[in-house]
């Protein structure tokens, strides 16, 4: 979780100090972090698609647990979705973030922390990404460097379908969550009938 937080803060720092579009920075650091994961995997002695394994049974069983009849990954997804919905759509923090995304100059004139607030948001997103990574590692039973590689386009599709503006300033957490579920179910359905999901 701390590594996810650190990666999010690095993204925020790069966006802040370079002035490059957040989408470009995020895609660039995707490959940077992927290379780091490949390096760590090689240092741990994992070869090919084997990944780092040998996790305790309690950890690998976590992704298959249920809570009130619902799978734990779905429960975590719902909890994280509600958390981000509350902070972005029901509080001052979210209103300030949307204003910073729409018009940073006006936000600066309104005495908002234009430089500090994105650090908080990217840090939170980094922690949420780390939670998702832990669930995936628990589900597959190994930490592979390429585990989330095929999720880039579905994630971007879900964000855009959910109403997010790729240039910032607008979006809906609930809409994006519903779009992510829709894209995921479409992928699974296509695989079940034998159609490639690319």
Predicted regions and their residues:
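Helix-loop-helix "hairpin" substructures at the membrane interface of multi-pass membrane proteins
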Residues: 1, 5-11, 66-143
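Alpha-helical transmembrane segments within multi-pass membrane transporters and channels
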Residues: 1-30, 178-183
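Transmembrane alpha-helical segments in multi-pass inner-membrane proteins
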Residues: 8, 122, 129, 139-198
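Helix-loop interface residues and adjacent transmembrane-helix termini in multi-pass membrane transporters
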Residues: 17-19, 90, 116, 167-170, ...
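Transmembrane helix-bundle core of multi-pass membrane transporters
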Residues: 22-91, 117-119, 139-148, 195-197
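Hydrophobic/aromatic residues within transmembrane alpha-helices
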Residues: 32, 106-107, 160, 182
């Amino acid at each position: 979780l701390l590594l996810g937080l650190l990666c999010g803060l690095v993204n925020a720092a790069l966006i802040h100090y370079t002035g490059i579009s957040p989408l470009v920075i995020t895609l660039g650091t995707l490959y940077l972090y992927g290379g780091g994961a490949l390096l760590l995997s090689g240092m741990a002695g994992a070869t090919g698609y084997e990944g780092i394994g040998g996790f305790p049974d309690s950890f690998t069983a976590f992704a298959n647990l249920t809570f009130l009849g619902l799978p734990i990954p779905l429960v975590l997804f719902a909890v994280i979705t509600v958390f981000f919905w509350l902070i972005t759509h029901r509080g001052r923090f979210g209103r300030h973030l949307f204003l910073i995304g729409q018009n940073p100059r006006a936000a600066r004139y309104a005495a908002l922390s234009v430089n500090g607030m994105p650090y908080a948001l990217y840090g939170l997103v980094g922690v949420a990404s780390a939670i998702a990574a832990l669930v995936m590692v628990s589900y597959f039973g190994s930490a592979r460097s390429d585990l989330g590689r095929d999720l880039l386009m579905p994630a971007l599709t879900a964000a855009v379908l959910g109403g997010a503006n790729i240039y910032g300033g607008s979006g809906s957490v609930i809409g994006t969550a519903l779009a992510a579920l829709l894209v995921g179910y479409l992928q699974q359905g296509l695989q079940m009938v034998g159609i490639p999901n690319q």
